[in-house]
């Protein structure tokens, strides 16, 4: 098959979205109520990694970057994830804290996008979560200088075994370079696939202490 034939095949890949619609009259006043309902349904549907979300940041040149992290907590203050503070994403957030999140629940023909500002979590919040993780995950946090170049996986594996021996007694200490961010909730868009590409999109925008809801064209 030529490259052109393959491209033509990709261009014709499509399907109808038939899982159901989303109507304005069914929307709660608070977007977190709908988010919680959708997240619960994603878990009940046994989606792989239902808390996985794409975090989009930009560097100092305006170049966007995306990666998948796991949502670890959410409330009216925002959505929380944890990371290595030496990572590319952490440096980009330090330079420009405006980010977007995306939950791609394809099987349910849904996605949720969040736009807001990322702020560092307190040491107390980070420490509480860090010590709730499996011990090997805690040790793993010490191993990698995230986003740095390495010559082989064996370097990481050797370092892990070395640190596992070092920390075999007592608690694993919290690395100074490990932390988390809370993304504020300024805008939340809910997308539900619809027949004939007439998808349902609703945008919640915070206005003072209330939420404004608008339907967007698909």
From Swiss-Prot:
Keywords: Flavoprotein, FMN, Oxidoreductase, Pyridoxine biosynthesis
Pfam families, per database record: PNP_phzG_C (PF10590), PNPOx_N (PF01243)
Database matches in SUPFAM superfamilies: FMN-binding split barrel
Molecular function terms from GO: FMN binding; pyridoxamine phosphate oxidase activity
Chain positions recorded as FMN binding sites: 67-72, 82-83, 88-89, 111, 146-147, 191, 201
Cofactor annotation comment: Binds 1 FMN per subunit.
PROSITE patterns referenced in this protein's UniProt entry, alphabetically: PYRIDOX_OXIDASE
Keyword Flavoprotein: yes
Reactions that this protein is recorded to catalyse: pyridoxamine 5'-phosphate + O2 + H2O = pyridoxal 5'-phosphate + H2O2 + NH4(+); pyridoxine 5'-phosphate + O2 = pyridoxal 5'-phosphate + H2O2
GO process annotations (BP): pyridoxine biosynthetic process
EC nos: 1.4.3.5
Cofactor(s) the protein needs: FMN
Superkingdom, natural source: Bacteria
Annotated residues for binding of substrate: 14-17, 72, 129, 133, 137, 197-199
Pathway of action: Cofactor metabolism; pyridoxal 5'-phosphate salvage; pyridoxal 5'-phosphate from pyridoxamine 5'-phosphate: step 1/1; Cofactor metabolism; pyridoxal 5'-phosphate salvage; pyridoxal 5'-phosphate from pyridoxine 5'-phosphate: step 1/1
Similarity comment: family membership: Belongs to the pyridoxamine 5'-phosphate oxidase family.
PANTHER family in UniProt: PYRIDOXINE-5'-PHOSPHATE OXIDASE, PYRIDOXINE-5-PHOSPHATE OXIDASE
Function (record text): Catalyzes the oxidation of either pyridoxine 5'-phosphate (PNP) or pyridoxamine 5'-phosphate (PMP) into pyridoxal 5'-phosphate (PLP).
Subunit structure: Homodimer.
HAMAP family: PdxH (MF_01629)
Full protein name: Pyridoxine/pyridoxamine 5'-phosphate oxidase
Taxonomic source organism: Escherichia coli O157:H7
Lineage: Bacteria, Pseudomonadati, Pseudomonadota, Gammaproteobacteria, Enterobacterales
Name of the encoding gene: pdxH
């Amino acid at each position: 098959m030529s490259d052109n034939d393959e491209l033509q095949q990709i261009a014709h890949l499509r399907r109808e979205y038939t899982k159901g619609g989303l109507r304005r009259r069914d929307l709660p006043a608070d977007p977190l109520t709908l988010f919680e309902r959708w997240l619960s349904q994603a878990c009940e549907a046994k989606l792989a990694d239902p808390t996985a979300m794409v975090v989009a940041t930009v560097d100092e040149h305006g170049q966007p970057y995306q990666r998948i992290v796991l949502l670890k907590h959410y409330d009216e203050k925002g959505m929380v994830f944890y990371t290595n503070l030496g990572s590319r994403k952490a440096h980009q957030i330090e330079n420009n804290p405006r980010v977007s999140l995306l939950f791609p629940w394809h099987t349910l023909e849904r996605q949720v996008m969040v736009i807001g500002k990322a702020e560092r979590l307190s040491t107390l919040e980070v420490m509480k979560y860090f010590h709730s993780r499996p011990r090997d995950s805690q040790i793993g946090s010490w191993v990698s200088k995230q986003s740095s170049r390495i010559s082989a996986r064996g370097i990481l594996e050797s370092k892990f075994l070395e640190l596992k021996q070092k920390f075999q007694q007592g608690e694993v200490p919290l690395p100074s370079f490990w932390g988390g961010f809370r993304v504020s909730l300024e805008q939340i868009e809910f997308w539900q696939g619809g027949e004939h590409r007439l998808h349902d999109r609703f945008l919640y925008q915070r206005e003072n202490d209330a939420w404004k809801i608008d339907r967007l064209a698909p």
